[in-house]
């Protein structure tokens, strides 16, 4: 529920309770006291009507699932406000005699004020219920946000791990290239060593043959 709506609602309930008391006392007053009381009642009705309009604007700007419940409450408040307007007209008319005032005080106003009190009681219960519902919705939203944040964190971790694996793969690929180059170098060195062995062997053979030939030549002479 909107905090603005709750604030206007509390103010309206306070004004409504005050108007009920003033309407009750106004019926038994006369002269200037009655005029003063009636002026205060009219001012209170105007203030209450302004609060109802503000609540209406607040409710219509809320999501549909919350707005529908608040509009039901607003109908109750408007009905309560209309009761006060009716009482203002009756008090203003000044045509009620003492007996009529007593009957109205004992019957009409008692019924009206009782109905208003019952309406306020039901509305306050509805307000508490909506407040609890709003709290549950807020808790659900908070849980969803926490879940989303956890999901984002997990995705970021997975992305980081993927980048690490890609870098490791690139490193291994570089190692494979170096190993391949090393193999080629070793193969080339091995071939050169083999060629050198044959060359050295040939040289040694030639030297041995030369020595043998020289010895043979000296011995035969």
From Swiss-Prot:
Forms SNARE complexes with t-SNAREs. Disulfide bonds: none annotated. GO terms for biological process: intracellular protein transport; plant-type cell wall organization; positive regulation of protein transport; root hair cell development; vesicle-mediated transport. The gene is VTI13. Pfam families: V-SNARE, V-SNARE_C. It comes from Arabidopsis thaliana. This is Vesicle transport v-SNARE 13. It is a single-pass type IV membrane protein. Keywords: Coiled coil, Endosome, Membrane, Protein transport, Transmembrane, Transmembrane helix, Transport, Vacuole.
């Amino acid at each position: 529920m909107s905090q603005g709506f709750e604030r206007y609602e509390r103010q309206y309930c306070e004004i409504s309770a005050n108007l009920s008391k003033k309407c009750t006392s106004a019926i038994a007053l006369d002269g200037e006291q009655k005029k003063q009381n009636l002026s205060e009642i009219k001012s209170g009705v105007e203030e209450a009507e302004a609060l109802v309009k503000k609540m209406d604007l607040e409710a219509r700007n809320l999501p549909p699932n919350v707005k529908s419940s608040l509009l039901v409450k607003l109908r109750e408040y408007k009905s309560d406000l209309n009761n006060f307007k009716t009482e203002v007209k009756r008090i203003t008319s000044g045509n009620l005699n003492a007996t009529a005032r007593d009957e109205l005080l004992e019957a009409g106003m008692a019924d009206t004020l009782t109905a208003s009190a019952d309406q306020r009681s039901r509305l306050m219960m509805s307000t508490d219920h909506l407040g609890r519902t709003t709290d549950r919705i807020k808790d659900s939203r908070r849980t969803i946000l926490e879940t989303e944040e956890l999901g984002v964190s997990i995705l970021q971790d997975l992305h980081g791990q993927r980048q690490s694996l890609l870098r490791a793969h690139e490193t291994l690929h570089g190692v494979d290239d170096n190993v391949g180059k090393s193999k080629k170098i070793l193969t080339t060195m091995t071939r050169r060593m083999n060629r050198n062995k044959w060359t050295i062997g040939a040289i040694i053979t030639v030297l041995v043959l030369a020595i043998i030939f020289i010895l043979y030549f000296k011995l035969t002479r």
